[in-house]
Amino acid sequence: MNIPLPRRSEAVRTAGAALVAVALAASTAPAASAANTPRDTSRQVQYVDCGTASGKENGSRSRPWRTLDQVNRLELKTGSSILLKRGSRCTGTLAPDGSGREGKPMVIGAYGQGAKPVIDGAGNAETLLLKNTQWVEASNLEITNSGNPGRNKRGVRVQLQDFGTGTHYRLTGLDVHDILGDDTKGTEGSAGILFSVTGSTVPTRFDDVVVSGNTVRTVDREGIYFASTWNNRPVHGDFDPNGPAYVPSTRIVVRGNTLADLGGDGIVITATDGTLVEHNRLDGFQRRSAGYNAGMWPWNADNTVFQYNEVSGGETTRDGMAYDVDEGTFGTVFQYNVSHDNAGGFFLVCTATGKLGNAVIRYNISRNDHFRGIETCRGSFDDVRFHNNTIYAGEGVSQTVVNENTTEKHEIAFDNNIVVKEGSGTASFNLKSGGVTLSHNNLVNTVGTPANPGGTTADPLLSDPTGAVPLGLRLRSGSPALRSGTPVPGSPDRDLYGNPVGNPPNMGAYQGPGTV
């Protein structure tokens, strides 16, 4: 994924210029009227029922607000709750003016019985917009925006603009669907859920974010995306020495989300440090975008861990693979993930015109991924370890197990892996740089196989390779891969299945004893 994020072309503004801009904005702002005067905000809980008849609304449960605009005009008390009635449908943009504090977050959720309340963006650019706020939690809402298809738009946008550090964000139990946006990405791109840092005058970042238990389906372009204008450092090709500095967001967790039918990428992490992406399910991506998109990947981010995710249904070979270690990333770990039935393959490792390093891809499963196992792109890199993975290519599947596009040096240590090709089609290696080394791999029916000291070409006796994933990719008793690997420094103590890793380890992702 070397599509650049939006580049900042302006230098940091001076304080004087900022004051001029504020004065100009004030001089051009419309005069207040009775229609947009903030309402009484003495109550802590604001109730909303867009299906109720008009009357003397005051935000109480008996006289709830009936439009989102009424809520947007409120100056909310710190730690207020905005509760939408279950079974109701509100049209427009919800953009509350409020925030929470430690121990008293602002809550946006539902009340009553029945289906989740619906916010329909009706073709607006934003559906739920949380801007320059913190200590906020949103849950149990249905969010859709199919109007004006092809327009730039988002389902949920959490935005910090020249804010500093914003703390504590929780998005849980949201059903985001039919966000029919355009084909853009980045800080102003179209997405189901977008965390967006913008501006160039105040160093700004997110801290303590959890995005969990949401569904994101039928969205153009991005599923869940983190982007920032504060992303400048000389490790990616879009570095602007006059732009905002590098200010990574921290303590980000993306967990247990279900994504499907995405025009472009699934989950993309940029300008963060220490993000955890786990237990997410993605089925169907790169379906409508003209760009290059993959399932889950980091860009210009450090120490990102992707684990226990499952990705399938990637379309096209632009990029169309499940996972990607992209440029400007260091300390990336992909472990305990499953990939299957992706047209573009299993993995991309791509530095383009930037740098990457210290990446580990281990204890993952790939079944019937087409086109390539590992793909590299232009640009060189070092210190990438691909070990203890199991790749199975069945009937009708052809794959280049490692495909180097150029002769630029790509240092990949390919150790303790199992690669099995069965049925029609081929599995081959296309090595050009001299940087890929193999050791202790179990390679069956591969073509153009390089030297593989300590390895074997015997049948690894996979338990049921066409059955359930990942259970079918275990090893049967008598497998030549059992305890035939070589120890890898820094390995975890358990495998994808929860088995302890022995010494020596098995080849492949499964580290338990032979199954019957």
Regions found by a protein language model. Name each.
Residues 1-35:
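Secretory targeting and sorting signals
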Residues 50-85, 89, 127, 497, ...:
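Acidic Gly/Asp/Thr-rich repetitive segments characteristic of extracellular carbohydrate-active
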Residues 54, 65, 83-86, 92, ...:
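Right-handed parallel beta-helix/beta-spiral solenoid domain characteristic of secreted/periplasmic
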Residues 92-97, 333-339, 351-472:
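Predominantly extracellular beta-rich ligand-binding scaffolds that present long acidic/polar faces
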Residues 104, 109, 127-179, 207-218, ...:
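Parallel beta-helix/beta-solenoid
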Residues 121-129, 149-162, 184-202, 206, ...:
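Extracellular beta-strand/beta-solenoid scaffold signature
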Residues 141, 174, 209, 214, ...:
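Consensus "Asn ladder" position of solenoid repeat domains
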Residues 470-472, 479-516:
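Surface beta-loop-beta hairpin patches that serve as ligand-binding interfaces in beta-rich domains
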